[in-house]
C-alpha cells in the first residue's frame, strides 16, 4: 500500500500577516471602546449593609462621574441583618419599621409599649421598637454622645492599625474620619462625610409615629469625587459614642445599569445592504374577495428596508428641496453631487440659544453618534471649553458652572466636541476635562456645481482660466436652523415652507446617521468574528506543537495575547439604538398640529389645495360684495336724480329782467 502524501509544512499554512492583523484588531477594539465623556448613563447610588445587600438607593440619568447626590439612608436601615444588639438581625431590607409604637397620654395605639414622653433608661439603643428608636435619636443628637465613622480597606497605609470588620475599622482613636460627635472628626483624604439629616425635634416626632427616624446625610468629598472605583464599592464602620461603642458596617457603591446584551457572532451583513435605489412598484390590481378552495389570506408584509442607494438619494433630494425653498434662483440650472469620500458631513457653527438642565431631558438621553467626528466646521462658533484649557479666544459661561447642568442646543443643532458629536454637554465634564465643543448644524457633503462647470466636464476641457469653485450645501444653507427658521417665525407661508423642507432634509440626515451607526456595529461584529477565527487558529497551532511546548516555544518568539475591548462597543451601540429611537419619537412629537394633520392624511393636501382658491374667492365676495353693491346702487340713484332734474327744467323758460325805472302799464 502506498503511503499517503505528507501534508505541507505548518509554516507554509501559517499566515505571516497574522500577528499584524491581531495587533490591528487590538488597536481598533481599544479605539472603538472609547466613548464620549458626555454620554448619559442610568446611574444608581446604593447604600448596602454588612451582608452587601442594598438597603437604600437613588437613581438618575447623568454622565459618568458628574452626579454626586447626598445619600440619605436611615441608621436603622444600615443595622438590618447586623449584630443582634441592634434588634434587626433577622429583619430584611426595604421593610416597614418594626413595632410596637410608643404609648402617649392622648392616644394609646393597640399594642403600644412604654410611654414616649416618659424618662428614658440607659439601655443599649436599638431599632426594634419605636421607643428604642427614640432612644437612638436622642443618642445621635446628644452634644456629648453621637457617632463616628472609620474608613475600611481603602484607608492609607498609615491607618492599617485601625482593625478590621470585627472592630468596625475603629480599633484605635484617630481612625475616625467623619461623624457627628463633639470633637468633630474630619479628614482630608476620605471619600465621604456623614452627619444627621434631621433635627432632634423632627426625628422625635417621626419616632413617635412609628417611622424610621434616624436619617443620615452622606455627602461626597473632593477626593471621593475624583475616585473612579465606586462600581466595586467602598466600606466604612460606624460606632456610637456611648458605653460599649456598638457599631455596624455599611458601604456605598455605584451601579451602571441598562447595559445591552452580548451580540452573537455571525456573518458580516454590511455588504448585503449595498443595494441600488429601489424602483417604484407598478400598480397592483385589488385582490379578489373570493378565496380559492383551501386557500388562506396572505399575511400583510411591511415595507422593505431602505438600501444604501435609497438613503443617498434621500439626502440629495432633501438637499435640493431645502435649497429650492430658500434660494429658488440657484436651482434653475445646477448639479448637486454627493461627495463619496470622507468626510461625509460637515458642520456649520451657529450662535444660537441653548438651555441648561439639572436632569437629562429626552433629547439628551439620546446617545447620538459619539463615534462620528467632524473634520470641518465653518462659520463663527459659540465655543465652550473645559476649565483646564489654555487661555484662548473663547467665551466662558461661568453661570452654568456653579452647579451640575446639561446644556442642550435647539432643535436641529448638536455639539461637536473633540470626542465626537453629542446632543448635550455636561458642565461637570467640561470642568474636569480639556474638551472643546462648538454648537453646529450638521449638513451632508453635497457640492453645488453650475451648468457651465458640467458642460466643461462633458466637453473634456482640461485647461481652465481659473480654478473651478465648488460650493457645498453647508455654505448655501448654513444657519437655516438658527437664522432662516428662527427669523422666519410669523412671516407667513414662506417660513412654513422653508421649515418643512429643512425638516425633510433633517430626517434624511438622521436616517443616514442611523445606518452609519449600524455599519459601525456590523464592523465591530466582523472584528469580533475575525478575532475568534485567529484565536481558534492559535489554539490549533498550540495543539500541533504541544510536544515542543506550544507555538511560541517552537517559533522561539514571545507570545502575544489578545485583549477584547469590544464589550464596551456592544454596550454603547445598544444604548445608541435605544436613544436613536427616543430621538425619532421626540422629532415626531415636536411637529405642530398643522404639520401632523398633513402627515396623517395624505389626501388632505390635494383636497385643500383644490378647494382653497374657490373658497378664498367666495369669502372675498361675501366680505366685500355688499359694500361694492351698495356703492353701485348709490351711483345709479345719483345718475337718475340728475336725469330727472334735466327733464323738469326743459318745460320752463327763463324770464328777462326789467330795465331800471321802467314801469309796466296795462
From Swiss-Prot:
TM regions (residue ranges): 608-628
Keyword ATP-binding: no
Chain ranges for the short sequence motif CXXC as given in the UniProt record: 334-337
Binding positions for Zn(2+) per the UniProt entry: 115
Residues under site feature: Cleavage: 466-467, 646-647
Annotated glycosylation sites: 42, 197, 290, 324, 356, 363, 431
The entry's keywords: Cleavage on pair of basic residues, Coiled coil, Disulfide bond, Fusion of virus membrane with host cell membrane, Fusion of virus membrane with host membrane, Glycoprotein, Host cell membrane, Host membrane, Host-virus interaction, Lipoprotein, Membrane, Metal-binding, Palmitate, Signal, Transmembrane, Transmembrane helix, Viral attachment to host cell, Viral envelope protein, Viral penetration into host cytoplasm, Virion, Virus entry into host cell, Zinc
Coiled-coil ranges per UniProt: 500-534
Cellular compartments per GO CC: host cell plasma membrane; membrane; viral envelope; virion membrane
Disulphide linkage map: 76-127, 102-116, 103-112, 150-170, 162-175, 207-213, 334-337, 334-560, 364-417, 424-437, 552-560
Superkingdom assignment: Viruses
Gene Ontology biological process terms from the UniProt entry: fusion of virus membrane with host plasma membrane; symbiont entry into host cell; virion attachment to host cell
Cytoplasmic face of the membrane: 629-666
SUPFAM superfamilies hit by this protein: ENV polyprotein, receptor-binding domain (SSF49830), Virus ectodomain (SSF58069)
InterPro entries given in the database record: FMuLV_rcpt-bd, TLV/ENV_coat_polyprotein
Lipidation (S-palmitoyl cysteine): 627
Region Immunosuppression, residue ranges: 535-551
Annotated region described as Fusion peptide, given as residue ranges: 469-489
Signal sequence range: 1-33
Post-translational modification: Specific enzymatic cleavages in vivo yield mature proteins. Envelope glycoproteins are synthesized as an inactive precursor that is N-glycosylated and processed likely by host cell furin or by a furin-like protease in the Golgi to yield the mature SU and TM proteins. The cleavage site between SU and TM requires the minimal sequence [KR]-X-[KR]-R. The R-peptide is released from the C-terminus of the cytoplasmic tail of the TM protein upon particle formation as a result of proteolytic cleavage by the viral protease. Cleavage of this peptide is required for TM to become fusogenic.
Motif CX6CC, chain ranges: 552-560
Locus of motif YXXL motif: 652-655
Domain notes: The YXXL motif is involved in determining the exact site of viral release at the surface of infected mononuclear cells and promotes endocytosis.
Subunit structure: The mature envelope protein (Env) consists of a trimer of SU-TM heterodimers attached by a labile interchain disulfide bond.
Protein name: Envelope glycoprotein
Amino acid at each position: 500500500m502506498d503511503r499517503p502524501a505528507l501534508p505541507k509544512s505548518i509554516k507554509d499554512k501559517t499566515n505571516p500577516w497574522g500577528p499584524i492583523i491581531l495587533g490591528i484588531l487590538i488597536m481598533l477594539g481599544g479605539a472603538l471602546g472609547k466613548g464620549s465623556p458626555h454620554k448619559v448613563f442610568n446611574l444608581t447610588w446604593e447604600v448596602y449593609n454588612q451582608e452587601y445587600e442594598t438597603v437604600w438607593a437613588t437613581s438618575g440619568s447623568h454622565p459618568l462621574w458628574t452626579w454626586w447626590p447626598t445619600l440619605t439612608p436611615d441608621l436603622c436601615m444600615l443595622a438590618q441583618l447586623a449584630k443582634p444588639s441592634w434588634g434587626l438581625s433577622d429583619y430584611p431590607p426595604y421593610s416597614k419599621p418594626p413595632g410596637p409604637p410608643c404609648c402617649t397620654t392622648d392616644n394609646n395605639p393597640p399594642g403600644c409599649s412604654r410611654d414616649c414622653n416618659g424618662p428614658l433608661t440607659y439601655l443599649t439603643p436599638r431599632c426594634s421598637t419605636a421607643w428604642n428608636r427614640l432612644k437612638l435619636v436622642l443618642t445621635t443628637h446628644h452634644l456629648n454622645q453621637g457617632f463616628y465613622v472609620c474608613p475600611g480597606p481603602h484607608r492609607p497605609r498609615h491607618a492599617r492599625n485601625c482593625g478590621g470588620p470585627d472592630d468596625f475599622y475603629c480599633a484605635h482613636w484617630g481612625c475616625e474620619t467623619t461623624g457627628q460627635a463633639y470633637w468633630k472628626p474630619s479628614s482630608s483624604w476620605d471619600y465621604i462625610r456623614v452627619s444627621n439629616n434631621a433635627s432632634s425635634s423632627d426625628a422625635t416626632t417621626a419616632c413617635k409615629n412609628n417611622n424610621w427616624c434616624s436619617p443620615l446625610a452622606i455627602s461626597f468629598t473632593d477626593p471621593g469625587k475624583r475616585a473612579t472605583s465606586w462600581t466595586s464599592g467602598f466600606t466604612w464602620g460606624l460606632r456610637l459614642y456611648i458605653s460599649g461603642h456598638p457599631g455596624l458596617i455599611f458601604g456605598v457603591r455605584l451601579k451602571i445599569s441598562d447595559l445591552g446584551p452580548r451580540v452573537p457572532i455571525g456573518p458580516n451583513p454590511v455588504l448585503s445592504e449595498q443595494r441600488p435605489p429601489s424602483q417604484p412598484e407598478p400598480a397592483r390590481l385589488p385582490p379578489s374577495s373570493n378565496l380559492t378552495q383551501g386557500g388562506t389570506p396572505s399575511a400583510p408584509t411591511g415595507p422593505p428596508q431602505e438600501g444604501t442607494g435609497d438613503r443617498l438619494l434621500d439626502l440629495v433630494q432633501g438637499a435640493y428641496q431645502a435649497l429650492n425653498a430658500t434660494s429658488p434662483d440657484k436651482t434653475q440650472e445646477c448639479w448637486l453631487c454627493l461627495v463619496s469620500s470622507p468626510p461625509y458631513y460637515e458642520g456649520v457653527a451657529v450662535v444660537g440659544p441653548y438651555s441648561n438642565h439639572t436632569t437629562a431631558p429626552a433629547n439628551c438621553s439620546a446617545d447620538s453618534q459619539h463615534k462620528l467626528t467632524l473634520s470641518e466646521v465653518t462659520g463663527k462658533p459659540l465655543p465652550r471649553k473645559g476649565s483646564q484649557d489654555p487661555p484662548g479666544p473663547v467665551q466662558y459661561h461661568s453661570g452654568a458652572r456653579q452647579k451640575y447642568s446639561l446644556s442642550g442646543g435647539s432643535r436641529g443643532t448638536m455639539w461637536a466636541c473633540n470626542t465626537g458629536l453629542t446632543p448635550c454637554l455636561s458642565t461637570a465634564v467640561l470642568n474636569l476635562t480639556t474638551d472643546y465643543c462648538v454648537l453646529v448644524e450638521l449638513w451632508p457633503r453635497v457640492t453645488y456645481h453650475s451648468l457651465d462647470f458640467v458642460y466643461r466636464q462633458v466637453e473634456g476641457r482640461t485647461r481652465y482660466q481659473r480654478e473651478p469653485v465648488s460650493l457645498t450645501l453647508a455654505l448655501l444653507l448654513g444657519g437655516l436652523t438658527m437664522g432662516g427658521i428662527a427669523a422666519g417665525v410669523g412671516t407667513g407661508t414662506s417660513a412654513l415652507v422653508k421649515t418643512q423642507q429643512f425638516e425633510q432634509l433633517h430626517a434624511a440626515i438622521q436616517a443616514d446617521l442611523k445606518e452609519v451607526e449600524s455599519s459601525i456595529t456590523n464592523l465591530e461584529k466582523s472584528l469580533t468574528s475575525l478575532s475568534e477565527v485567529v484565536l481558534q487558529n492559535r489554539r490549533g497551532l498550540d495543539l500541533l506543537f504541544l510536544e515542543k511546548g506550544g507555538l511560541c516555544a517552537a517559533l522561539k518568539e514571545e507570545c502575544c495575547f489578545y485583549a477584547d475591548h469590544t464589550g464596551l462597543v456592544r454596550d454603547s451601540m445598544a444604548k445608541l439604538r435605544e436613544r436613536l429611537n427616543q430621538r425619532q419619537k421626540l422629532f415626531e412629537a415636536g411637529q405642530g398640529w398643522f404639520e401632523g394633520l398633513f402627515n396623517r392624511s395624505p389626501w388632505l393636501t390635494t383636497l385643500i389645495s383644490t378647494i382653497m382658491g374657490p373658497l378664498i374667492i367666495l369669502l372675498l365676495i361675501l366680505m366685500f360684495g355688499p359694500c361694492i353693491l351698495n356703492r353701485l346702487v348709490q351711483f345709479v340713484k345719483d345718475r337718475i336724480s340728475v336725469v330727472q332734474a334735466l327733464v323738469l327744467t326743459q318745460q320752463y323758460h327763463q324770464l328777462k329782467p326789467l330795465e331800471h325805472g321802467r314801469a309796466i302799464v296795462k
